[in-house]
Amino acid sequence: MCCGPLGFCGPCSPCGGPCGPCGPCGPCGSCCSPCGSCCAPCGPCGPCGPCCGGCGPCGPCGPCCGPCRPYCGC
C-alpha cells in the first residue's frame, strides 16, 4: 500500500522514479509522495496524474480523468 496523490492509501501501480516499484513505502508523505500518480488507486494507469485518484479502480471517469482514458478504457 502506498500513499496516493490525494492523501489516501491504496494499491500501488508499478512505475519507475524515486519510489521504485511503489511497494510498501510507508505513510503518506514518505517514499511515495514524489511518485504520486503511479500510486493512484487506478491500477496500471501509468503516469496519469493526480486526477487519476478520482477514477477508483479504473471505473467511471469524469472529465478530470481524461489522462486515464487510454489506460482505463474510459
Swiss-Prot record:
Q: Which family does it belong to?
A: Belongs to the MST(3)CGP family.
| UniProt free text on domains | This protein is mostly composed of repetitive C-G-P motifs.
Q: Which GO terms describe its biological process?
A: sperm axoneme assembly; spermatogenesis
Cite the entry's keywords alphabetically. Developmental protein, Differentiation, Repeat, Spermatogenesis
Q: Which gene encodes it?
A: Mst84Db
Which top-level group of life is the source organism from? Eukaryota
Describe tissue expression: Testis.
- Write down the species: Drosophila melanogaster
Entry protein name? Male-specific sperm protein Mst84Db
